[in-house]
Amino acid sequence: MNQTLLSDFGTPVERVERAIDALRNGRGVMVLDDESRENEGDMVFAAEAMTLEQMALTIRHGSGIVCLCITDERRQQLDLPMMVTHNSSQFQTAFTVTIEAAEGVTTGVSAADRLTTIRKAIADNAKPADLNRPGHVFPLRGQPGGVLSRRGHTEASIDLATLAGYKPAGVLCELTNDDGSMAHAPEVIAFAKLHDMPVVTIDDLAAYLQSRAKKAS
């Protein structure tokens, strides 16, 4: 990743700490992956703290595919099968079947309905019957070990939410440009500045977690 583009957001460690602080205070962050990977920026929120206004922003400026990033333990609690038995996608993105809250929604597609679905799915006592399948929210199963085992936006979302003191669940959506094309680093950074969101890269987060692990050992 071009560090010059990111210089306004601090050093790699500062970027991670500012992202954690933003989530802790109920704000969203922009997460960039490597230029050699998807080279995309995702809007990321802690699922537990996401607001209706943030969901509306996500739908308005994103791809429309709003994803709930969860652990495999949560996936099993909700009895959500994987979307396919053989994942042939390039980066092994682990979609489960899509979901909708069984109660409290209309068509399921509005910002309020999607937020209701997410809140139902992450509730401590959530059970399979709380959700209908299919729906308009796309759960993603994170890999155990987070970004240290897979350098994906899914794992970064869960890791960041956890570091901020929330349940291990994040909401993400890819940022798109006005013409419908995918936003890359320059557009992501411009969007982040406009909406007062920190920017962090997955490599930043991985290095931060590796450093913490070394200090703890």
From Swiss-Prot:
D-ribulose 5-phosphate binds at residues 37-38, 42, 150-154, 174. GO terms for biological process: riboflavin biosynthetic process. It holds the Pfam family DHBP_synthase. Mg(2+) 1 binds at residue 38. InterPro entries: DHBP_synth_RibB-like_a/b_dom, DHBP_synthase_RibB. The keyword DNA repair does not apply. Pathway: Cofactor biosynthesis; riboflavin biosynthesis; 2-hydroxy-3-oxobutyl phosphate from D-ribulose 5-phosphate: step 1/1. SUPFAM superfamilies: YrdC/RibB. Homodimer. PANTHER family: 3,4-DIHYDROXY-2-BUTANONE 4-PHOSPHATE SYNTHASE, GTP CYCLOHYDROLASE II-RELATED. This is 3,4-dihydroxy-2-butanone 4-phosphate synthase.
